Amino acid sequence: MPSLRGLSIAAIAAGALFASPALAHPKLVSTTPAADASVETPSRITLTFSERLMPRLSGVEVIMTGMPGMPNHRMAVTGFQTSTGADGKTLIVALPRPLTTGSYQVTWHAVSADTHRIEGNFAFAVK
């Protein structure tokens, strides 16, 4: 007959095994435009994560980091609307107008059910 100690250890190990996915942080899976891409004038930016997000606690900042003739010109892009896609895993940044030629950095933060905030950034260029 299994001992109480052995059963306890097995229960803890099984709990840890099955609880791990629930405690995982969301990971950025893909972006449009892709990181380091050079694209035509986008009218929206999307970020897809590995888990459903808490929309009120997740968001982005879009900065123009350079433009033709002014490589170190930093200017915030304003007036965009952020929403969550039907899958709950995609942040959609609807820009008020297509982005102009230059380089851009998107800084994001995301929170899922585990309530831990993760953050990161990626850059792309507009031709």
Predicted regions and their residues:
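Acidic, low-complexity Ser/Thr/Gly/Pro-rich repeat segments typical of extracellular/periplasmic
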Residues: 37-40, 54-125
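Bacterial N-terminal signal peptides that target proteins for export
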Residues: 1-11
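N-terminal edge beta-strand
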Residues: 23-42
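Intrinsically disordered, low-complexity terminal tails and linkers in eukaryotic proteins, enriched
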Residues: 11, 23-25, 60, 65
